Every structure is written in C-alpha cells, then in structure tokens.
UniProtKB/Swiss-Prot annotation:
Similarity-based family: Belongs to the NrdI family.
Segments passing through the bilayer: none
InterPro entries membership: Flavoprotein-like_sf (IPR029039), RNR_Ib_NrdI_bac (IPR020852), RNR_NrdI (IPR004465)
Organism: Bartonella henselae (strain ATCC 49882 / DSM 28221 / CCUG 30454 / Houston 1) (Rochalimaea henselae)
Gene Ontology biological process terms from the UniProt entry: protein modification process
Gene from which this protein is expressed: nrdI
Name the record gives this protein: Protein NrdI
Function: Probably involved in ribonucleotide reductase function.
Length: 132
C-alpha cells in the first residue's frame, strides 16, 4: 500500500474522496505546506481556477512541490474537479503531471462516486505493484 498525499479545500471533497481509499494519508497543511515526505507518493489535488484557468493549482500544493525532496518522490497525480468548469475540469492535475513528468492516473468529480472509488483502489494497487 502506497502513500497518498492530498490537499483539500473547505468543501472537503478531496478529503472525503481519499478517506474512502484505504490508503495511508498525508495531508498538505495550508499553514505548513513545506513539510517533507520521505517515500514515493501519489498526489490527490482539487482544481482552483478562475474563468480563464489561471491559478488552478492551490498555492499550498505549489509550495509543497517546490521542495526538491517532495518533487523527487511524486509518482503520479489524481485530480478532483467540477465538470461545470468545462475545459478547466481537473486542470490542476494536468498541470502537475506535465510539470513533474508523472502520469495523471485518474480524475473524479466533486466527491467522486462509488465507481470512482473502486476504480482508483484497483488502479492504485496495480500502480504500486508496477513500481516495486
């Protein structure tokens, strides 16, 4: 079982989603985002974006990933979002995947569905086995 690092907003959608995954969790603290992880992880992140797609990645996540050790250990990203935002849906995960050269493993809407949870659990199990 791998480590899930996540950031959740006041809505709690991302936190709810990751709590259903039966994985070890590490929450990026908005007030202390420079905390370090010491093992490979998958990042789960919501999208914050204005109407033009700007500022999609939460600032705390940017600060967390600006730490070299944290950036070296990211192995994949899962994105949360809201389809009402069209092309900006789950934009943060796409940006992070591109900048960190890791795969975007999955995208879910709002709190995710039971089907999303099942897919992500199975996908993470396969993903972590491939990395070993």
């Amino acid at each position: 079982m791998g480590l899930i690092v996540y950031y959740s907003s006041a809505t709690g959608n991302t936190e709810y989603f990751v709590s259903q995954l039966d994985q070890r969790l590490f929450k990026i603290d908005k007030k202390k985002p420079s905390m370090l992880v010491d093992e490979p992880y998958v990042l789960v992140v919501p999208t914050y974006a204005d109407g033009e797609g700007k500022m999609a990645v939460p600032k705390a996540v940017i600060r967390f990933l600006n730490e070299d050790e944290n950036r070296k250990l990211i192995r994949g990203v899962i994105g949360g979002g809201n389809r009402n935002f069209g092309r900006y849906y789950s934009l943060a995960s796409k940006i992070i995947a591109e900048k960190c050269f890791v795969p975007c493993l999955y995208r879910f809407e709002l709190r995710g569905t039971e089907e999303d949870i099942i897919c992500v659990k199975k996908g993470l199990e396969r993903f972590w086995k491939q990395l070993v």
